[in-house]
A protein has these predicted regions:
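Low-acidity, Ser/Thr- and Arg-rich intrinsically disordered low-complexity segments
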Residues: 5, 10-11, 15-16, 22, ...
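Short Gly/Ser/Thr- and charged-rich N-terminal loops/segments
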Residues: 26-27, 46, 60
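Bacterial N-terminal signal peptides
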Residues: 44-57
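Replace the tail clause
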Residues: 58-232
Length: 232
């Protein structure tokens, strides 16, 4: 959830025991958005995913796979190289992805993961390899995938941004950014279907898209700029 308050952040990442040392962070200026209020918000929205979750997903598989040569092809990271076969049009971290988001005026879906992270593999398998989910993401977001081990500086930057927004900062890390790089919502692992009080990735995508459209000025005027590493 997004909360405007000071906080001290220190969190280990899974079994690797990697942690960010406790750091006093400035409060976020964005309004509070909890999972509960997100569900209320989603209840007022048109069912964006209805058409995607309808029958016919199997017919989409071959078409998406045939055009799934994304921007991770040729990456030196074996983790990103495997994701190059996914139907999502992933970009690596860099200016090209942010330039594309500005050109299309779309929010950015950013996924931070690692080869050794079991929940990263599970989220890939459950959600990112599903053709109907990939179609929705490709139609509404510009997507970036980051390898924790290959890009530790970027990983630390993303974790600091999540902490600034009082969001979970483990692995996988799921973040939603404005085209200019302002992080405005996110979390960690999200299941394909709601489970144990945790929203599904589909719900998070709908909510992030709605926030981007309805609170654009607030997002751009506050929060943590992941691209420039500046907290406002």
């Amino acid at each position: 959830m997004l909360l405007g308050r000071d906080m001290t952040f220190s969190r280990k990442i899974l079994s690797r025991g990697i942690a960010i040392k406790s750091t006093k962070l400035k409060p976020s200026k964005l309004p509070g958005v909890s999972f509960a209020s997100m569900r209320t918000l989603l209840g007022k929205l048109p069912p964006l995913l209805c058409a995607l979750l309808a029958t016919g997903a199997a017919a989409q598989v071959s078409a998406l796979r045939a055009t799934s040569s994304n921007h991770l092809n040729g990456s030196k990271s074996s983790y990103l190289q495997r994701a190059s076969q996914q139907p999502i049009d992933w970009y690596p971290w860099g200016e090209e992805a942010f330039r594309k988001a500005k050109e299309l005026d779309r929010p950015i879906l950013l996924d931070l993961g690692a080869e050794w992270c079991p929940y990263c593999a599970q989220m890939d398998r459950e959600s990112y390899e599903r053709p109907e989910m990939a179609k929705f993401i490709n139609d509404h977001f510009v997507s970036i995938k980051v390898d924790f081990d290959m890009q530790p500086e970027i990983a630390a930057r993303l974790q600091r941004a999540q902490a600034y927004m009082n969001l979970p900062a483990g692995l996988p890390l799921t973040a939603f950014l404005s085209p200019s790089g302002k992080l405005y919502f996110g979390g960690g692992y999200f299941p394909a279907e709601p489970r144990g009080g945790k929203p599904s990735l589909g719900e998070m995508l709908e909510g992030a898209l709605c926030l981007f459209r309805e609170q654009r000025k607030t997002i751009e005027s506050g929060g943590f700029d992941v691209w420039t590493q500046e907290g406002v």
